[in-house]
Amino acid sequence: MAKQRDPVIDSMRGIGIVLMVLGHSGFPGTDFIYLFHMALFFMLSGWLFSLRGGPVHFIKRKAVTLWLPFVLANTAFTVLNNLFLKLNILTSDERILQVPGNAVTTPVTVKDVIGRTVHWCVFDGGTQLGGAMWFIQALFQVSILYALVEFILQRLLHGADTLLPQGLFSGVLLWVGWRCGLAGWNVWGLGIAASCYCLFYLGTVLRRTTRESIPTYQRGIFAAAAFAVLLILGRLGSVGLAGNGYSSPIFLLAASLAGWVLVREAACLTAPLPCVR
């Protein structure tokens, strides 16, 4: 029997994807969107987290769905590097450096392709065209670490609730990730992973604590309140998870939770509509 899909979660994913596209297209509200849109995906992943089947099965599944696509995509971009140079998709012209977010690209050899693929396998670096895959890398690292910690805690606590120790661990990692961001340290993307672990954890907490039966008018009030909070936060600081940058750990948590409330209430209000089903 096919697994029953949650229309609200599907709607939240859809809203998140739309926000991501808008945020990367010069949309006037980009700074507002960046406050929470990537945190939303980590939290959704935490919401859907399950160790059913055991940690080995979980790790194998994540290797196929996250690690392998990361390696294959970056390897493909490297193999096609010289073709992209000829087509002017990439360039060796140093004037490109005047445009933020770009880099000078040089031709590669077969040796370069092999060597760089080895680096992709351990998340060491990336390609210019594959820059957006930082999320895939971070989600893989966070998911695997969370699963291992969960498995160890279940063994140590003999089946007792792991929510509190996981929360303490995520708090420590959030502080470490924030300090890494301030220091500019992000080897193998571990600084970003440390910061985002708490977002994954929040998703697991929200799944256990969220009330489903809420009157429609209350959902509208919650969404409006969350929107107002995000407007205020947007004047106080910013979030850029791709570079492990955020004003403070508390700021990241507040913006992420407000964004979750806004998107979830919007999804709950729109999921029953015929055009969304």
Predicted regions mapped to residue ranges:
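Hydrophobic alpha-helical segments of polytopic membrane proteins
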Residues: 156-168, 203-229
